[in-house]
Amino acid sequence: MARALLERWEQLAGTASYDAKELAKLCDLSVRQLERDFRRALGRSPQNWLNEERIKAAQELLLSGQPVKVVAFELGFKQVSHFCRQFKFLNNTTASKFVLIQTQEIRNVAHR
């Protein structure tokens, strides 16, 4: 898979809700070919990769002070509850606890 295509999707991943079908269309590939290329190059499906990228973007937005609801909708989740489940699945903690833990760690480092 061309690196440029992956970079393009990385840009899209943090801004809205894209799925494998939309990416395949953007890349002028069939969905099946895109899935094969992704699995070969990255070891996971396009949708799993996209979910991971969206949650990484969510972490940054949450740490910048954005509310969970705003982050969820900004990253294309149609329901806050779906965002919360996805966040917890990938981070083993809730979004609110993630922010609390990260801000405490930052304070601890600052006081050393």
Where are these regions (language model features)?
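Terminal helix-turn-helix DNA-binding modules in bacterial transcription factors
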Residues: K21, R40-K78, L100-R112
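Basic, amphipathic alpha-helical hairpins
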Residues: A2-D19, F38, L42, Q59-P67, ...
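Catalytic cores of transferase enzymes with a strong primary signal for eukaryotic protein kinases
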Residues: R8-E10, R32-L34, P46, L50-E53
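Nucleic acid-binding interface residues in structured DNA/RNA-binding domains
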Residues: T94
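Append "Primarily bacterial transcriptional regulators
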Residues: K21-S30, L34, F38, V71-K78, ...
